[in-house]
Curated annotation (Swiss-Prot):
GO molecular function: rRNA binding; structural constituent of ribosome; tRNA binding
Alphabetical list of PROSITE patterns matching this protein: RIBOSOMAL_S12
A biological process from GO: translation
Native source species: Aliivibrio fischeri (strain ATCC 700601 / ES114) (Vibrio fischeri)
Protein name: Small ribosomal subunit protein uS12
């Protein structure tokens, strides 16, 4: 335990909290342009072709963003909105593309969990 005199001379150091999504710079989402759209394979024990894209953000960062849902319409030069949220089995992927915003269309024929995939309410 430090004495009061020691604390007066050298106060306690504040703990620095490291962000999991530094490219967002404390914003909820950021806009960017796709520089490359491709598929990649997850780490063991999973197996798939995960759809991802490299995005150059408006603040100059270049990040890898996951494209959720079945099928997408993204290609190079598409303007997308990204949010935080990593993909556990893809190392280096710490962002998600927001479906149904800007150039990224919502998922076709999606009936459940629509809000996460940018789908409007179907006509009954």
């Amino acid at each position: 335990m430090a004495t009061i005199n020691q604390l007066v001379r050298k106060p306690r150091a504040k703990q620095v909290v490291k962000s999991n999504v530094p490219a967002l710079e404390a914003c909820p989402q950021k806009r960017g342009v796709c520089t490359r759209v491709y598929t990649t394979t997850p780490k063991k024990p999973n197996s798939a072709l995960r759809k991802v894209c490299r995005v150059r953000l408006t603040n100059g960062f270049e990040v890898t963003s996951y494209i959720g849902g079945e099928g997408h319409n993204l290609q190079e030069h598409s303007v997308v909105l990204i949010r935080g949220g990593r993909v556990k089995d893809l190392p280096g992927v710490r962002y998600h593309t927001v479906r149904g915003a800007l150039d990224c269309a919502g998922v076709n024929d999606r009936k459940k969990g629509r809000s996460k995939y940018g789908v409007k309410r179907p006509k009954s």
